[in-house]
Structure formats: structure tokens, C-alpha cells
Regions:
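Basic, flexible Lys/Arg- and Gly-enriched helix-loop patches that mediate nucleic-acid binding at interfaces
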Residues: 1-265
Length: 265
């Protein structure tokens, strides 16, 4: 094995996504052969003594992938959040997994739980343009002008313009409407801020797809393990360069066996 960047080795050992591992390095919590290291340095785990917070770096783990349906009111975090339930509470037997594609507290839907730092990077970094698809319930139906502005990109606070997105009205819902949105980026609370800029209000937000992986028939709080073939297909979907497309059928079917569900107490 040749030398690898520290954040890659750390992610492979299940310490989190590459971005999270980079933050550990920046914070001075990582050393190689007794010396603090800087971001971008490399090491060989066969010969170098790599430590995080003074503890030896564990060997690379066998990769694991879980599709999880995060309910509303559950925090997309591994750390305790007072009395609030976290995604770790929903998959208590998968302590070394971390969430990829976080959702805010009031949003729901698909989250990937994994210890594969490389896949996590490809699913979340904007340069890979991995598609995420959402169903969004708006308090009132948007007009065509609002939809067109959303499709072209909306200027957010600070002057940042969002990337083009595929947006269409799916069905009416009283005075409001369900809207389908496909995006190649996913900044924190981006859809909610876009809606606010357009004079709209989000009532409900559900993510139904990440790359080739669909939420499928998973109910809130349930999770299922992906097969190796599904994981490879998901990784391959991060290389796609075609224009965003709305899903018409499951690309990864939600298998009924091996479904986990947190029992209510």
C-alpha cells in the first residue's frame, strides 16, 4: 500500500466523511509518528503511527450501507441532542456509520448511513453533481414565473445563486401544491430559502432519491441494508453528467427483507 492522504485513511477507518476528517486535521487532533500534521499530508498505515486524539487509527472497516427513512423531528446527527431523537437512535446496531445527505429537523425522507468516506464525498461534494430529488408541499401553488426563476437559479442571501434545477408541479393540494424538485447540489435548508425568496412557504419536504437510490417503500424510521451491487450503482451515479431528470420508477428497489425498524417504547 502506498501513502494516502490522511483524510482518506481516516474515512476508511469509519471516523466520518472526508470533510469531517479534514476538520479533525485542521483542529490539530491528528498526528503521524508523534508529530501534528497539516491538511494534505500523506501517510502509510503499514509503517506510520497514525493517531487521532492520541488513539491509534483503527484498520479500515468493511464498508456498510443503509438506506434510512428519517422521520420529521429526528436530528440528522450522531451526537446526542438533548431529548431529541437522532438518526443513530434509529439504527443502534450500526454505531460506526455516519449520515450522508443530512436533512433539517422538519424535513423527512432518504438518508444514507455508511462508513464509506469515498462514497460520502462523491454524494455530497458539489463538483460531483450527484442528483437529489424531493417532493415539496407548498402552501400555495406557484405560478409559471416563480417556477421558471427557480429552474434558472435563485439569488440567496449573500449574493449566492443556486444552480439550475428541474422543478415541476406534481399535483394540487387544496390551495397549495406538491412540487417535484431535482437538484445537483444540496446546501443547508436551500429549498426552504429558495421558496421564501419566491414568496412561497414550505409545508412539508421529503427527499425521495439520492443518485440512483430511491426511498421506495421504506416507512418513517425504517432502514435497509444495500447490496454490493446497489452500492456500486450508487457510486456510478455520481459520475453522471446528463441534465437532471425526474425519477419515473425505482432504480434501486426497496427490498422487503432485512428491514430494520426502531421499536417504540
Amino acid at each position: 500500500m502506498t501513502s494516502e492522504r490522511l483524510q482518506k485513511l481516516m474515512a476508511a477507518a469509519g471516523l466520518g466523511s472526508r470533510r469531517a476528517c479534514e476538520e479533525l486535521i485542521r483542529a490539530g487532533r491528528v498526528s503521524v509518528n508523534g508529530k501534528p500534521i497539516s491538511l494534505g499530508e500523506k501517510a502509510d498505515p503499514r509503517h506510520d503511527d497514525i493517531r487521532v486524539d492520541g488513539r491509534p487509527l483503527a484498520a479500515a472497516e468493511q464498508t456498510m450501507y443503509l438506506a434510512l427513512h428519517k422521520p420529521r423531528g429526528v436530528v440528522s446527527s450522531l451526537e446526542p441532542q438533548g431529548d431529541r431523537q437522532t438518526v443513530r437512535d434509529l439504527v443502534p446496531g450500526a454505531a460506526r456509520l455516519f449520515p450522508v445527505g443530512r436533512l433539517d429537523l422538519e424535513s423527512e425522507g432518504l438518508i444514507l448511513m455508511t462508513n464509506d468516506g469515498e462514497l460520502a464525498l462523491r454524494l455530497t461534494h458539489p463538483r460531483y453533481g450527484c442528483e437529489k430529488e424531493y417532493r415539496v408541499l407548498l402552501s400555495r401553488r406557484p405560478d409559471e414565473q416563480q417556477l421558471e426563476i427557480w429552474r434558472r437559479g435563485v439569488v440567496l442571501e449573500g449574493g449566492l445563486r443556486t444552480a439550475p434545477a428541474l422543478v415541476r408541479v406534481e399535483s394540487p393540494a387544496g390551495r397549495g401544491a406538491w412540487v417535484r424538485v431535482v437538484m445537483g447540489e444540496g446546501r443547508k435548508r436551500e429549498i426552504r430559502e429558495i421558496a421564501m425568496r419566491l414568496g412561497l412557504s414550505v409545508v412539508r419536504l421529503q427527499r425521495i432519491r439520492i443518485g440512483s437510490l430511491l426511498l421506495g417503500s421504506l416507512r418513517p424510521g425504517q432502514s435497509r441494508e444495500l447490496t454490493a451491487a446497489e452500492a456500486r450503482q450508487l457510486l456510478a451515479s455520481t459520475h453522471a453528467t446528463q441534465s437532471p431528470k425526474l425519477s419515473r420508477r425505482p432504480l434501486v428497489r426497496a427490498a422487503r427483507p432485512r428491514v430494520r425498524q426502531r421499536q417504540r417504547e
